[in-house]
């Protein structure tokens, strides 16, 4: 992790490109830096390279799901404290509990309000920065 940024950087991990770009643009519109990763492997490369202040993580992705990404994030001491907001169409209590056990800071179900997501991520970034 080498990058230093003036504005907080949010990594959006979403395999649906159109939704991902809308979310990225919402963060940019609110003065945050944001980038889209389309799968879990790309997400881990970006995390290692750019050190995001927060991650918005879809659970249901091809090849490597969000649970796997979350497990890897939490197992690496260099990046284990990055706040992760899980965003998913999965409404089940067991999935929500599992994501929380793996270290998700928040869990948002689709469809969601962009303003609400941005607000939640901003709050996590601020509290993480203060810690």
Language-model segments: what does each one mean?
Residues 16-35, 124:
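Two-component/phosphorelay signaling modules centered on CheY-like receiver
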Residues 20, 61-63, 80, 92:
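The feature encodes the CheY-like receiver
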Residues 50-56:
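Active-site beta3 strand of CheY-like receiver
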Residues 45, 67-80:
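Short amphipathic alpha-helix used as the core "switch/output" element in two-component signaling
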Residues 112-122:
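C-terminal output helix
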Residues 24, 68, 91-108:
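Alpha4 helix (beta4-alpha4-beta5 surface) of REC/receiver domains from two-component response regulators
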Residues 39-42, 53, 65-71, 91, ...:
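Acidic catalytic/metal-coordinating carboxylates
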């Amino acid at each position: 992790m080498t990058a230093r940024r003036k504005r907080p950087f949010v990594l959006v991990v979403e395999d649906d490109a159109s939704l991902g770009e809308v979310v990225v643009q919402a963060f940019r519109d609110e003065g945050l830096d944001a980038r889209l990763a389309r799968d879990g492997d790309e997400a881990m490369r970006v995390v290692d390279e750019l050190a995001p202040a927060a991650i918005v993580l879809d659970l249901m992705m091809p090849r490597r799901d969000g649970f796997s990404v979350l497990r890897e994030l939490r197992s690496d001491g260099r990046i284990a404290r990055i706040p992760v907001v899980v965003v998913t169409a999965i409404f089940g209590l067991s999935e929500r509990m599992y994501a929380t056990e793996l270290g998700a800071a928040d869990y948002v179900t689709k469809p969601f309000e962009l303003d609400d997501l941005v607000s939640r991520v901003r709050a996590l970034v601020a509290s993480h920065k203060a810690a």
